[in-house]
Amino acid sequence: MGQKINPLGFRLGTTQNHHSVWFAQPKSYSEGLQEDQKIRDCIKNYVQKNKRIPLVEGIARIEIQKRIDLIQVIIYMGFPKLLIEDRPRGIEELQINLQKEFNSMNRKLNIAITRIAKPYGQPNILAEYIAGQLKSRVSFRKAMKKAIELTEQTDTKGIQVQIAGRIDGKEIARVEWIREGRVPLQTIRAKIDYCSYTVRTIYGVLGIKIWIFVDEE
């Protein structure tokens, strides 16, 4: 069996960038890492609670930049209206919540939202879409094909979608996948976006993996 490496970690420094940009002493590094995770979880929970459409979060990624006196959080969203339109003070509220959570009086916390032009070119948003379809008991093949149709509008060069688990409630778990175009996982200069997503259905847990071949550098 071939050993599968995470496509994002494999390309760090060439076509992929870090989502956390800061330096720390070895002693305090783990604290900084846990803090990042808490910030991401806090933002996701807030969006989950305050969104209009129940199945779409629309967060592609969250970047965190830290300086001595400032934590800058950039949320890349496919559908920022979900967060901004309903609550004009949504970002301020989120900022206050995070500030309370970390009671970091000596550090200012700043949140910015960046809109992604083609949200369905992002594997996280696509995985959420497929998860929503599976929860609504749409057949998995139909959900996968629809996801591929959505990416066709975004100028991607290839996509692979994989669903694993008790598909359609069958007794035996299996893996089903579908590929459209090229997905060169071994080419380091190929910019590949990847995401793995867990969805809880009434039959059990399903795993969704999506690889999107964006471009070659």
Swiss-Prot record:
GO molecular function, one term: structural constituent of ribosome
Gene Ontology BP annotations: translation
Gene3D superfamilies xrefs: 3.30.300.20, Ribosomal protein S3, C-terminal domain
Record-annotated KH type-2 domain positions: 43-117
UniProt xrefs under CDD domains: KH-II_30S_S3 (cd02412)
Matches recorded under InterPro entries: KH_dom-like_a/b (IPR015946), KH_dom_type_2 (IPR004044), KH_sf_prok-type (IPR009019), Ribosomal_S3_C_sf (IPR036419), Ribosomal_uS3_bac-typ (IPR005704), Ribosomal_uS3_C (IPR001351), Ribosomal_uS3_CS (IPR018280)
Localization, UniProt: Plastid, Chloroplast
GO CC annotations, alphabetized: chloroplast; cytosolic small ribosomal subunit
Pfam families, sorted: Ribosomal_S3_C
SUPFAM superfamilies in the cross-refs: Prokaryotic type KH domain (KH-domain type II), Ribosomal protein S3 C-terminal domain
Main location: plastid
Keyword set, alphabetical order: Chloroplast, Plastid, Ribonucleoprotein, Ribosomal protein, RNA-binding, rRNA-binding
Subunit and interaction comment: Part of the 30S ribosomal subunit.
PANTHER family: 30S/40S RIBOSOMAL PROTEIN S3, SMALL RIBOSOMAL SUBUNIT PROTEIN US3C
Family membership: Belongs to the universal ribosomal protein uS3 family.
Name this polypeptide is given: Small ribosomal subunit protein uS3c
Organism in which the protein naturally occurs: Platanus occidentalis (Sycamore)
